């Protein structure tokens, strides 16, 4: 379960299933019953701000994605109207989604940027039930958006990014 909430939208009883899963995972986290792979991702996110890659690697990753798809993807602009975020897979295996977003922003003339300070919207803390980490990662996105003057945070369709950011 990615806690995307799609099941909730079709539940005939109106039960917020994703919220139930979130609460169950939080209880398991508090009890120390997180699977080791998720615990490893939790530790990486605490250190790097992402379970998959350190923020300092973001400029090089975006440069590679830009070359691969022939579209500029701004990184670390001091001012931007839109903070662009991604799920880890969009920075490695599924770069077309990120390139498509960059093409749309470039075509419409919107000033968007990804930023080392807050770029990963997947929020492993939300997935693991680690509420402290969830808040830290969400706060990084919000603080980065405020820092660069962004009025919009563009979230990926990773399943639970919106729920985590809310």
Feature map (PLM): residue ranges:
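Iron-sulfur-cluster electron-transfer modules
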Residues: 1-164
């Amino acid at each position: 379960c990615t806690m995307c909430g799609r099941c909730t939208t079709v539940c005939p009883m109106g039960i917020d299933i994703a919220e139930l899963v979130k609460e169950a995972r939080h209880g398991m986290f508090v009890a120390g019953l997180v699977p080791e792979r998720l615990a490893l991702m939790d530790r990486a996110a605490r250190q790097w701000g992402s379970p998959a890659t350190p923020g300092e690697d973001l400029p090089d990753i975006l440069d590679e994605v830009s070359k691969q798809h022939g579209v500029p993807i701004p990184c670390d602009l001091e001012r931007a109207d839109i903070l662009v975020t991604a799920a880890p897979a969009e920075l490695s295996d599924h770069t077309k989604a990120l390139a498509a977003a960059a093409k749309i922003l470039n075509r419409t003339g919107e000033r968007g940027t990804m930023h080392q300070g807050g770029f990963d919207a997947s929020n492993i803390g939300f997935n693991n039930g680690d509420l402290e980490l969830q808040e830290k990662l969400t706060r990084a996105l919000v603080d980065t958006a405020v820092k660069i003057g962004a009025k919009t945070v563009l979230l990926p369709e990773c399943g639970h990014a919106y729920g985590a950011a809310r």
